[in-house]
């Protein structure tokens, strides 16, 4: 069996304990065999400044770029805000434009929101612009995410099965790469 390579999970929500974060925490619980690192606080990243992209890059930006660069793949789980991706996630991606950290990097993404369609489309466009490798089977749109949680806080079975299938398949795909 191929050893599990490190996969970075980025939570795109501006809200602590968001539905997307809860969803990915449950994935972590059910997948202890997968080598994950979760980055769930985009609020610590300074606002994008083109003057600082190469020289005097802020420490937090260097750190997240290193996480991305050193990971075999990245999973982004995010809501949609006003038909777009959250500003903090867009900020992170803007900090990566002048680098090659996403070039040829396998990326999976889950958009969990009330609707999510436009944010999902926008994230795909941005990831392709960054040179990420995004496979159709490694994308999932979860509409009406609030209604996908049981009273005990767990994700309902049908939705969770789809998420787990995406994550498991993505991990196998990433682990098979040289």
Which residues fall in each region the model found?
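Short, glycine-/small-residue-rich phosphate/pyrophosphate-handling segment
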Residues: 105-144, 158
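Short alpha-helix boundary/capping motifs
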Residues: 1, 120-121, 147-156
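Amphipathic alpha-helical protein-protein interaction surfaces
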Residues: 16, 98-101, 115, 135
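Phosphate-coordination loops involved in phosphoryl transfer and adenosine-cofactor binding
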Residues: 4, 103-104
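A glycine- and small-aliphatic-rich helix-loop capping segment at beta-alpha/alpha-beta transitions
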Residues: 94-99, 126-130
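N-terminal beta1-alpha1-beta2 submodule of the flavodoxin-like/Rossmannoid cofactor-binding fold
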Residues: 1-80, 84-96, 154-178
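Mobile beta-alpha loop/short-helix "lid" or hinge segments that flank ligand
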Residues: 36-47, 99, 131-151
């Amino acid at each position: 069996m191929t050893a599990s390579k490190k996969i970075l999970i980025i939570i795109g929500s501006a809200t602590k304990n968001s539905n997307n974060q809860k969803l990915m925490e449950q994935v972590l619980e059910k997948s202890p065999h997968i080598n994950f690192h979760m980055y769930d606080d985009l609020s610590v990243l300074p606002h994008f400044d083109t003057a600082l992209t190469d020289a005097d890059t802020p420490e937090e930006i260097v750190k997240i770029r290193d996480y991305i660069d050193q990971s075999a793949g990245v999973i982004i789980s995010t809501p949609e805000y006003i038909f777009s991706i959250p500003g903090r996630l867009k900020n992170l991606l803007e900090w990566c434009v002048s680098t090659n950290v996403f070039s040829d990097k396998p990326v999976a993404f889950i958009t969990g929101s009330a609707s999510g369609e436009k944010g999902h489309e926008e994230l795909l466009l941005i990831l392709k612009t960054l040179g990420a490798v995004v496979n159709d089977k490694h994308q999932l749109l979860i509409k009406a995410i609030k209604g996908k949680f049981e009273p005990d806080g767990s994700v309902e079975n049908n939705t969770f099965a789809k998420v787990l299938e995406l994550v498991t398949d993505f991990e196998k795909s990433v682990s098979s790469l040289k």
